[in-house]
Amino acid sequence: RPINNTFENLGRETFMMPVKWSEDGFPYMTQGDDLVPVIVRREGVKRDESATFGNFEMNDGFDGQTLGMEWMTLRAPATGLYSLSQTPGYLTLKCDSVSASEKKVPAFICRRLQHHKFECSTRMLFCPQSKAEQAGILLFKDEKHQYFLAVGRDDQGECISLRQIGDGESKM
């Protein structure tokens, strides 16, 4: 579902539909100009109660031994950059010099967007010691397209900033 035929924020989407085959071997899911239905009900198939489509709310208390399957890291496992046991009930990220704009593994735990419209929030304990340290919420499309709402430090002390990263530029 591209936005204005330029960007696709949700990545790949998979739809499951019954398939029929024509006499000449082509698969089809609908007839003529029929629309693909939003929901296809199949006899004997029950909806998973943990399904995350439509309107839903997701909260994580980070009280398990491992991150849930909905969480992921960027590019490769971030082994050693986060902990669930250092402070039980919290996800602890370790400050690292790698940013999400680099093609390396940053201290970044995320989940994929599932809707074009959403709300997200977090609670955070963070005391930056230098201008180089920042933590917050990152909306990441790729290395050149991001929004970063961060707590950091400037000449006056702790500060909050919103940075737009686009086409190699960074705007505050």
List PLM regions with ranges.
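Short edge beta-strand segments in beta-sheet-rich domains
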Residues: 11-16
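Extracellular glycan-recognition regions
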Residues: 17, 21-172
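Short, loop-centered acidic/histidine patches that primarily coordinate divalent metals
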Residues: 1-2, 165
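Short, conserved, GDST-rich strand-edge loop motifs in beta-rich repeat architectures
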Residues: 2-9
